[in-house]
Regions:
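Bimodal feature
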Residues: 59-65, 130-134, 149, 154-157, ...
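Short, Lys/Arg-enriched, Trp-marked, Pro/Gly-tolerant hinge/linker segments that flank
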Residues: 124-126, 144-154, 165-193, 197-211
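A short glycine-rich, His/Asp/Glu-containing loop-to-beta-strand
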Residues: 9-29
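N-terminal regulatory/effector-sensing and dimerization cores
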Residues: 22-114, 147-151
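A hydrophobic/aromatic-rich effector-binding and dimerization subdomain
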Residues: 8-16, 80-141, 171
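Amphipathic, well-ordered alpha-helical segments in soluble domains
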Residues: 43-46, 131-135, 157, 161-164
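Short, small-residue-biased leader/transition segments that mark boundaries at the very start
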Residues: 1-6
Length: 213
């Protein structure tokens, strides 16, 4: 099945603007017959109501309220528009931020947008979820009162959201890596104990493999 290309209208608010916040129930109207689509911009989707499957480049997640899904330009997305009833999409183009920093790849270096990122999903705490939704509301208000060329507050608000998400994502991945190391260390310890106990009578690798399972 082919995917529909979603191209953002830079002139939606009259003057060119490279950032927007839209409700998912509004986005649904533009997903023609199929919910499979490809974006030409960065998208951070916040689920606020309902739950259902949400796929990003063949990785499928069961999305629930307070979940965040990250998408890069060119990635194929598909989500259950019937059961995920609402949320917000924070969408922006790289150049809106990149020229402000010495690092022209600032956006690509965010933990959740890196090529090697382990997951496109992050679940927010109640406190962080509330704080970010308030900031999204501020972004929307700033956009609604937008004057051409006056993007400094918008950039600051977008930067705040990205940094909060980056910190939370790094915390999530460090916890997962810690769990993985703990499991690995437990296996090593168990193996060493088995060898110490049975080394004299058991020399088969299969014996120890069976005991570790």
């Amino acid at each position: 099945m082919g995917s529909e290309m979603c191209i953002r209208d830079r002139h939606k608010y009259g003057s060119e603007l490279l950032v927007d916040v839209v409700e998912l129930k509004y986005v649904k109207k533009f997903l023609a017959k199929s919910a499979v689509h490809t974006l030409n911009y960065y998208d951070i989707t916040f689920i606020t109501e309902g739950k259902g499957a949400f796929s990003v480049d063949n990785q499928t997640y069961e999305a629930i309220p307070r979940d965040v899904l990250f998408s890069k330009p060119g990635e194929i997305r598909n989500w259950d528009t019937h059961h995920i009833t609402n949320g917000y999409a924070l969408i922006f183009e790289e150049e809106f931020l990149s020229f402000l920093f010495k690092d022209s790849l600032f956006v690509q270096h965010l933990s959740f947008f890196q090529i090697e990122s382990s997951s496109s999903l992050l679940h927010l705490s109640d406190e962080l979820y509330t704080r970010i939704l308030e900031t999204l509301h501020d972004i929307k208000m700033e956009i609604d009162s937008y004057q051409q060329g006056d993007v400094h507050v918008l950039r600051a608000l977008l930067y705040e959201v990205l940094m909060l998400l980056d910190r939370a994502y790094l915390k999530m991945t460090s916890i997962e890596e810690g769990r993985s190391r703990e499991v690995s260390n437990n296996h090593v310890s168990k193996f060493m104990n088995l060898v110490a106990t049975h080394a004299k009578e058991q020399h088969s690798v299969q014996y120890y493999a069976d005991k570790l399972c």
